[in-house]
């Protein structure tokens, strides 16, 4: 009798631990890569975030936002991108007054397409691009208790800015292998009403005309695993590419839930037209949009996890000839996916998902029968 109770207790605790781990998005602690690493380095990203998060840079901070925009322009240009600052008309602010805003846009074609001498010259009109997106404005004023506070934008969206620059820097090391190119779009006024992305979509079709995949890098907290929390409709081919990720972490349920929430991201503007993925950390929500979103609270482990997932995905995209078609990622089916600690990512068609659920239910009934009959 004691042995049976021991088995039952042990089984209960194992199930409880697994359930909590899945619910919390548990990922085993990982070592971050140092500044001298040949691969993606969270330490190097943190150097950029230190500059990005020096001061609040919301739509209420015109000078600070301009200084940050110039820094980002310089960094992208320094890496060899054809970089420009795109200004838009002044618009009314929903918190009073008016403000102006500007996007930062940079293009990195494959070698040969930009006159670098690659023997396999590719005409510009035949090249497809991945568009990496983050926003460089921080949250405008927020009331916390009795205080008015401003976010420093270290995670939201310093993570996105720094991670994208590190990804591009790493990808340029194998540029002679590229079959596709990279575009970077750092949008302004995302926190207000996604004004930068809305204006780019409406007024700058050249940014998107040759893009067949969008990756948006966001933050909904400051730490925790980097979650693939949203994909475009018909995501089967997008998820095939995401299968290249190291330490993948995501679940399709979050995409479903997110459709009912009011807080959109830049990805919301384009996801129904261009296939793509949306990433964010979601732990420590109490820091979100407050002055606690500052450099001292960033998580190198979280930053490294973004990079561990996106670095191999980007390399596969850039070097794979099968991704050159404009419709390479347009699928007919939605894939149900989820990640389990240690075991990794599981993906199913909706039909396969129903069969899996039926099999699990049948297994449950069998175990229940054995338990009732013999225990």
Feature names for model-found ranges:
Residues 5-8, 33-35, 150, 369-371:
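Intrinsic low-complexity, intrinsically disordered segments enriched in polar/basic residues
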Residues 21-33:
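Bacterial Sec-dependent signal peptides at the C-terminal "C-region" and cleavage site
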Residues 1-7, 346-348:
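Short, Lys/Arg-rich N-terminal segment immediately upstream of the first membrane anchor
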Residues 339-375:
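Core alpha-helical transmembrane segments of integral membrane proteins
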Residues 6-9, 13, 215, 252-253:
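Short secondary-structure boundary micro-motifs
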Residues 8-24:
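Hydrophobic membrane-insertion alpha-helices, especially the h-region
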Residues 30-347:
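Soluble extramembrane regions of membrane proteins in the secretory/endomembrane system
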